[in-house]
Amino acid sequence: MRNPPALEQLVEALRCLPGVGPKSALRMAYYLLQRDRKGAGILAKSLDQALQVVSHCNLCNNFSEQEICPLCASPARDRTLLCIVEMPSDLMMLEQTQTYQGMYFVLMGRLSPLDGIGPRDIHLDKLLKRAQDGKVEEVILATNYTVEGEATAHYVSELLRARGIQVSRIARGLPMGGEIEHVDSGTLAQALLERRHVR
């Protein structure tokens, strides 16, 4: 027996979410229709609203309801620093540290040739325009330390350095509160290589 066409369409739509396969999508659809129809309506309305009003900031490429997001519009930010991150969640994590007061650029992904994601897919043309605006003095690469993140950082650094822009990379090392005996050898080796002099 097959499910009604509208239910099948809902299941297929839910499968677009990361990590959601056919069984999970079917369970979600059953739950929303059987146990939380009100929640399903709120979800549908919220998704529709977000699709209508949320786009990308013209400067940092982060999600925003305005052409220029509040962070980019803030006069308190240091416009000489530009930190490049892969995703909006990375920007949010950096903001939570309350230590960085510069500007951002969100790539909305990372280079991944195996997945068909090339330079055009991560807004590098927009990044180059931003980095060469005459205000930026240093670009900080804060991509993840994954194979794709490293490849992205390398590619972007080559593009920027060829244009005379100073580029730095966030450090790798031990996590705050971490104990050496519980750290993997790769992280420990990197922490030793990237050690700093004590002042």
Curated annotation (Swiss-Prot):
<keyword id="KW-0863">Zinc-finger</keyword>
<dbReference type="GO" id="GO:0006310">
    <property type="term" value="P:DNA recombination"/>
</dbReference>
<dbReference type="Pfam" id="PF13662">
    <property type="entry name" value="Toprim_4"/>
</dbReference>
<comment type="similarity">
    <text>Belongs to the RecR family.</text>
</comment>
<dbReference type="InterPro" id="IPR000093">
    <property type="entry name" value="DNA_Rcmb_RecR"/>
</dbReference>
<dbReference type="InterPro" id="IPR023627">
    <property type="entry name" value="Rcmb_RecR"/>
</dbReference>
<keyword id="KW-0479">Metal-binding</keyword>
<keyword id="KW-0227">DNA damage</keyword>
<feature type="zinc finger region" description="C4-type">
    <location>
        <begin position="57"/>
        <end position="72"/>
    </location>
</feature>
<dbReference type="GO" id="GO:0003677">
    <property type="term" value="F:DNA binding"/>
</dbReference>
<comment type="function">
    <text>May play a role in DNA repair. It seems to be involved in an RecBC-independent recombinational process of DNA repair. It may act with RecF and RecO.</text>
</comment>
<dbReference type="InterPro" id="IPR034137">
    <property type="entry name" value="TOPRIM_RecR"/>
</dbReference>
<dbReference type="Pfam" id="PF02132">
    <property type="entry name" value="RecR_ZnF"/>
</dbReference>
<dbReference type="GO" id="GO:0006281">
    <property type="term" value="P:DNA repair"/>
</dbReference>
<keyword id="KW-0862">Zinc</keyword>
<dbReference type="InterPro" id="IPR006171">
    <property type="entry name" value="TOPRIM_dom"/>
</dbReference>
<dbReference type="GO" id="GO:0008270">
    <property type="term" value="F:zinc ion binding"/>
</dbReference>
<feature type="domain" description="Toprim">
    <location>
        <begin position="80"/>
        <end position="175"/>
    </location>
</feature>
<protein>
    <recommendedName>
        <fullName>Recombination protein RecR</fullName>
    </recommendedName>
</protein>
<dbReference type="Pfam" id="PF21176">
    <property type="entry name" value="RecR_HhH"/>
</dbReference>
<keyword id="KW-0233">DNA recombination</keyword>
<dbReference type="Pfam" id="PF21175">
    <property type="entry name" value="RecR_C"/>
</dbReference>
<dbReference type="InterPro" id="IPR015967">
    <property type="entry name" value="Rcmb_RecR_Znf"/>
</dbReference>
<keyword id="KW-0234">DNA repair</keyword>
